[in-house]
């Protein structure tokens, strides 16, 4: 969280009676730096879930798969198949890509805490796209688990409308 928003966060916690013990890490210049700041506050040898706030529709089944795989294999990254056609665009040219060889990566990306803390001690690399890419640079193999298609990333106004519709549909069941 940006340092300038800490007071607002505390006000929200009071207003909504959010009393679960927690720590808030200061956001960094990039996602890498923000996650690194959060990991510095974390102790122990348990499992850590690193999740995007812009993915509010993660399922309990996805969380369970991530946890169980991270316990057994050290890490777990949810993924869903690509359902649309994909084209590679470069130097003014484009060509189709075999989407059967592609997956979309989601969060929470889940890790044994000491493993991901060690990975985040390496210097920042602009090629890091997510936590899995940070760990992968250490030589670790990334374990993909089944994600859930509803766990969309809310980037555009249309994404927010879609999420609202999914929540309305879920609550009307």
What positions do the PLM features span?
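Conserved N-terminal catalytic core of the sugar/cofactor nucleotidyltransferase
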Residues: 1-45
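Hydrophobic helical membrane-anchoring modules
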Residues: 151-173
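Glycine-rich beta-alpha junction loops
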Residues: 1, 81-84, 149, 158
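Residue-level signal for inorganic ion chemistry
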Residues: 38, 51-52, 81, 112, ...
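Conserved core of the sugar-phosphate nucleotidyltransferase
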Residues: 57-145, 173
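Short aromatic/hydrophobic "clamp" motif used to bind/position activated sugar donors
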Residues: 47-49
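Hydrophobic packing residues within well-ordered alpha-helices of enzyme cores
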Residues: 9-13, 66, 116, 163
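Short glycine-rich anion-binding loops that position phosphate/pyrophosphate groups of nucleotides
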Residues: 4-5, 30, 53-56, 83
């Amino acid at each position: 969280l940006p340092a300038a928003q800490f007071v607002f966060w505390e006000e929200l916690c009071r207003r909504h009676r959010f009393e679960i013990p927690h720590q808030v890490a200061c956001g960094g210049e990039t996602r890498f730096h923000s996650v690194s700041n959060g990991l510095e506050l974390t102790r122990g040898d348990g499992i850590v879930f690193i999740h995007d706030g812009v993915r509010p529709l993660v399922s309990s089944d996805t969380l369970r798969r991530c946890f169980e795989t991270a316990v057994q294999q050290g890490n777990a990254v949810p993924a869903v198949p690509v359902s649309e056609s994909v084209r590679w665009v470069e130097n003014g040219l484009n060509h189709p890509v075999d989407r059967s060889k592609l997956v979309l990566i989601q969060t929470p990306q889940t890790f044994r805490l000491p493993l991901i803390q060690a990975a985040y001690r390496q210097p920042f690399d602009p090629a890091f796209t997510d936590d899995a890419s940070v760990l992968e640079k250490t030589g670790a193999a990334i374990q993909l688990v089944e994600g859930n298609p509803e766990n969309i990333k809310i980037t555009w106004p249309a994404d927010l409308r879609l999420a609202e519709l999914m929540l309305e549909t879920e609550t009307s069941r």
